Amino acid sequence: MAKVLYITAHPLNEEQSFSLAAGTAFIETYKEEHKDDEVIHLDLYKEEIPHIDAHVFSGWGKLQNNKGFEELSQEEQAKVGRLSELSEQFVAADKYVFVTPLWNFSFPPVLKAYIDAVAVAGKTFKYTEQGPVGLLTDKKALHIQARGGIYSEGPATDFEMGHRYLTAIMNFFGVPSFQGLFIEGHAAMPDKAQEIKEDGIRRAKELARTF
């Protein structure tokens, strides 16, 4: 049985969001095809994801100086404890499905906060004399991304930094398989928006059967 983290980073719902429409189709089909797997949905707009701030640095510093967790302030305990929960949950999963829009050439900031929470030395990667080495070598990941313009080819290609960033992070973590499913052009070609959406949903369902 595999454990799947279905990670969505969009404030709207599947009726309003092309990425969530494809993501919902993917995960529903996945559940039908992999009935023994456990799927955990993390809606990053609803989850408590602490930003790495002064309280977090202070708490980490105290722990590194051999102070007990109970010696941290209440706010330090809450933030450091939650960050630890998120990173442990991430490491325990077998598969990751990220669902995002493309906003200002990247993804919503809640996903960056989440990546910061799980990018932990000793858990998702380690430092060696040869440099950092990823530890998640038995995982696989997928990024479902909707983007209103055309970024797969043409002059805007270099401006797409959301999927490129996730590709770099998954590689840094050692994840050997990272796929992308893109729904694009619906804002540039509004007369074809419904067709583009339906095609994205179809491709998402197909991919779910073999992911």
UniProtKB/Swiss-Prot annotation:
Q: What class of enzyme is it?
A: oxidoreductase
Q: Which UniProt keywords apply?
A: Flavoprotein, FMN, NAD, Oxidoreductase
Q: Which cofactor does it need?
A: FMN
The UniProt record gives the binding positions of FMN as 17-19
Q: Which organism is it from?
A: Halalkalibacterium halodurans (strain ATCC BAA-125 / DSM 18197 / FERM 7344 / JCM 9153 / C-125)
Q: Per the record's keyword annotation, is Oxidoreductase included, yes or no?
A: yes
Subunit notes for this chain? Homodimer.
Per the entry, what this protein does is: Quinone reductase that provides resistance to thiol-specific stress caused by electrophilic quinones. Also exhibits azoreductase activity. Catalyzes the reductive cleavage of the azo bond in aromatic azo compounds to the corresponding amines.
Record text on cofactor binding: Binds 1 FMN per subunit.
E.C. numbers = 1.6.5.-, 1.7.1.17
Q: What is this protein's record name?
A: FMN-dependent NADH:quinone oxidoreductase 3
Write the signal peptide boundaries. Answer: none
- Where do the TM regions start and end? none
Q: Which family does it belong to?
A: Belongs to the azoreductase type 1 family.
Q: Reply yes or no: does the keyword Magnesium apply.
A: no
Q: Which NCBIfam families match?
A: PRK13556.1
One Gene Ontology term of the molecular function aspect: oxidoreductase activity, acting on NAD(P)H as acceptor
What's the catalysed reaction? 2 a quinone + NADH + H(+) = 2 a 1,4-benzosemiquinone + NAD(+); N,N-dimethyl-1,4-phenylenediamine + anthranilate + 2 NAD(+) = 2-(4-dimethylaminophenyl)diazenylbenzoate + 2 NADH + 2 H(+)
